[in-house]
């Protein structure tokens, strides 16, 4: 039977103290396992304590190593981030700087509504008055529909400011809407002048606008205030004169058949009778003028139909042999 050098601990009969030798937990290759058993008690205890210290030192070393590794890793990460930041800064330096800037003028004008655009143009004229004539030249002329719509809006503004709990025709009502009334009448005057000859050469356009503007004026509330009555009467008289100016613009032309054609096409005689009745005969001269033109035209047409063989113009009625009045014939007489 093979024997080993390892011996189990025994109890000495002469010594009552027990010596317990613990098996070392460390497996140090430099210390044989059997030599530990044969060591004396003090030496073994010292060795065991030393082993424990070594184990603790090994643990501290591993912790230190881990901490060092973590520190190194953190340092490496920090260096990587710094290098990344440095590279990103380098890239930003190459990228052109983008900063905010105002809208271009065409985009700015596109974004403005009617009210703000009007304020912009008026402010521009206030700063640079010399631009007024240029703006008038380059701006397009408003259409009849747009012109009438603007006057209608100003008329509606008057109606909307009338008091609810008061007589509409009272002085209080008139004083309340007076600023809006003045603005309305001023606009009517400006637009009428815009549709008069020689600026407006189309008689039909001028008369169409005058008809709509006349209706708006006499549809105003009939305030009892004397100032309003005088203002309204004067305005209607001036509008009636403008009708005469438009109708007589081609009076110098031979025949002047355009006005008769327009009177028939627009049914002006019926409309003027209505205006004259509502305005208390303010349009009587205009009605008489239209009647006179229609009568003259009818007389000419009747004469042409009666004498179909007669020339239609005065120059054709007169035929003169000018050879009798030559210088040679005169001297021979």
From Swiss-Prot:
Keywords for this protein: Cytoplasm, Nucleus, Protein transport, Transport
Ranges where the record places region Disordered: 1-76
Coiled-coil segments on the chain, per record: none
Listed GO biological process terms: nuclear protein quality control by the ubiquitin-proteasome system; proteasome localization; protein transport
Pfam families: Cut8 (PF08559)
Gene Ontology molecular-function annotations: proteasome binding
GO cellular component terms listed in the entry, alphabetical order: cytoplasm; nuclear membrane
Polar residues bias: start-end ranges: 1-13
Chief place where the protein resides: cytoplasm
Compartment list: Cytoplasm; Nucleus
Domain of life: Eukaryota
Cited function: Involved in ubiquitin-mediated protein degradation. Regulatory factor in the ubiquitin/proteasome pathway that controls the turnover of proteasome substrates. Targets proteasomes to the nucleus and facilitates the degradation of nuclear proteins.
Assembly information from the UniProt record: Binds the proteasome.
Family under the similarity heading: Belongs to the cut8/STS1 family.
Name of the protein this chain belongs to: Tethering factor for nuclear proteasome STS1
